[in-house]
């Protein structure tokens, strides 16, 4: 079977959530046939060493960036005057319906590729990218819905920290998609979703739950071990280039961490991962008990030293990999209701996880776990087996195989 995988996320490096998902999808698809990678990204955004690794380890057959919103429609006439300003204005004001039309840069490149190479199936990540390809959804085309624009905009409306303008803007964008997106989903041969509840989204009633696999570190995971009873270390891992992570971190630092330190004066909060601007990192570094570590060689030692981890996320789409990783390393996680989405079937609030909404409740959950080592260890021990089972590569690859075999039988 010859498979064309189209994605906007490079499969390397895998310390970023979207990249990790792309790499694991390619790995699962490769168990069913030959996989060609078409990367819908700007080559200038890829550091040369990263691109070299991608070319070395994957069958890269195309690298073309979709046009920016400022390059489409009437915006394109004004863009030469001030590209940066026009792109930002178009991101705020351009109709979101245009995101679901064949892209003037991407579609011709893919048309040429598919004229030269016979593919048995196309797998594409994200509805907007799939529609930009110009490939007929009934090719057969498997749509990998790892996040949805509807969920993203809805989360911005529901975010307790969102201002009036942000909520109104998100509501306007959501209204543009309400009538057109469900019909587009229904045109595809098959849709994969990352969370079981995503099948409740209009248009995805026929979707198959694919989920995501946990990418185990080289050398494997350490055996489940209790946390150090004396540990007062709390950690958050993520890429802070990703806005939901940066906003969630800021919410925790401003509204929750002072309450935790007031009750547990020796508590330490480690912020791990790339993407914080130097001014923001410097400001956080002045917060008592907070340590900005940035990118670290290995996350293992920090999980070993911490009492538990955090996922204070309020916006976005898809699923929070940081929750899965925490349990894989044997540490419980304190989550917001939004970060809990996708884990309802394997983590139970109060028995294997702590879900808290208000700043006061979130702080209380952290304080209680810092003071009760036995409880945090019970939560981790109860959650780890279910998480590793539901998010195993074997289950994930099995769903991929069943889908492609079913499509092949219809051809």
Regions found by a protein language model. Name each.
Residues 142-143, 150, 170-221:
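Donor nucleotide-sugar binding/catalytic pocket of nucleotide-sugar-dependent glycosyltransferases
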